[in-house]
């Protein structure tokens, strides 16, 4: 989801994955999406589960649909 990826692009590696998931949850819920936190690394948005991982190659967080 482009909206989720664009949101987390604003965060560097100084934030924990748990905090990132929490902030992404709040942002997406405020935008009117159906959201739930599966666990520290996973967020479900509108029925699709996303894994948050670090991309050292690109120097940013990645939200990958699984």
Label the model's feature ranges:
Residues 6, 15, 35-38, 43, ...:
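Hydrophobic transmembrane signal anchors and adjacent membrane-proximal interface regions, especially
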Residues 53-66:
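Intrinsically disordered, low-complexity regulatory segments enriched in Ser/Thr/Pro
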Residues 2-30:
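N-terminal acidic leader/helix
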Residues 21-56:
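Acidic, low-complexity, intrinsically disordered interaction modules
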């Amino acid at each position: 989801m482009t909206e989720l990826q664009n949101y987390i692009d604003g965060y560097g590696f100084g934030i924990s994955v748990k905090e990132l998931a929490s902030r992404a949850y709040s942002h997406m819920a405020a935008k009117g999406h159906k959201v739930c936190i599966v666990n520290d690394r996973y967020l479900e948005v509108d029925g699709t589960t996303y894994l948050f991982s670090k991309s050292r190659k690109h120097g940013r967080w990645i939200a990958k649909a699984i």
